[in-house]
Amino acid sequence: MSNKLISQMGLPSSLANVFSARNILTAKDALSLPEFDLMALLDVDRDQVRTAVARISEIACPPCRTALSLMEDRALTGGYLPTRLLGLDRALRGGIPFGALTELVGPSGIGKTQFCLKLALLAALPSSYGGLNGRVIYMDTESKFHSTRLIEIGRSSFPHIFNSEGMAQEMAGRIIVLRPASLDELTESLQQIQLIILQHDVKLLIVDSMAAILVGENERSTTGQKQHSCHLPLSFLKSLAEFSQIPIVVTNQVRSQNNYEVVHYPFQGIQWAHAVTIRLIFEAHSGQRFIKISKSPTSPAIAFPFLVKSSGIALLSDEGLEVTGSEMSTIRCEGLNVLVEGAEPFPHLGC
């Protein structure tokens, strides 16, 4: 709740604009500052500051809920977007959760985009076929979205649907693709998305990838600007997930100290790791690729070997491998080039 944007809290526009001009953008930004500091920064009197802080506190503070009401809400909304990977869905207690931020992190070419494409199809499918029967917003920052691969996954996974006349076009037409090329464009797109979600019955938001935008931005920024550039879209995505109660999935890249390291780390740092609700690590070692549940409030740390097929990602076993200690958070990239070269010959798999 602390990440709610002040611009959406119903403050007088003149005061909301002053907050924005001083880069005080979220409830946390405002409530972390003493009253006199806010008066000095905003150049307004104490009464205005107190009124604004009271309003921000009221909006940001979550209402009291009983465990029963939370359970009833979860049962009413369904709560999850199933991935159709039986072992993973079972471990995640149903799939990708509604109202939360789920991160997919791993090296390029491991299968993150393949996973995202399948999720997009699953959200667009009619309810009678187990889908969410809605639209999908797919923010493609690296131009890795391929409509031909999307249809290929659909026809291989759901031939009874996609071989029907006009169904492939209908499913593809439910997926809205945006291609922001900079942080400013990404931020502008995110600010427009809240209204789009309400108007167009959007059931899933995918950002593939957040890191790609921030890499170039960070190269041009100071340390303080780097933290701010990461904080703004992250705060908005968390607020958007809570507000819309749809699943939001973001992909993240990895980094290493040099080109010879086997163990890699997420490109985004500690702040990002704490913000996401679910973290799924995509890694390669022992001659196989794995999806690993690295962070989840309800699931064990467990890894599943997988491969990429014409129908998308497929688990080699629904029985996961227990992960302990440092293995829970590390990302191994052993022999990934060999795995990619030896994969089935689909032209769009390197994502």
Where in the sequence are the language-model features?
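The Walker A/P-loop phosphate-binding site
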Residues: V18, D37, L41-L42, A52-N163, ...
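Conserved, well-folded catalytic cores of nucleic-acid-processing
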Residues: R55, I59-P62, A91-G95, P107, ...
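Hydrophobic/aromatic beta-strand patches that form the interior of the parallel beta-sheet core
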Residues: T102-L104, I137-M139, I176-L178, V249, ...
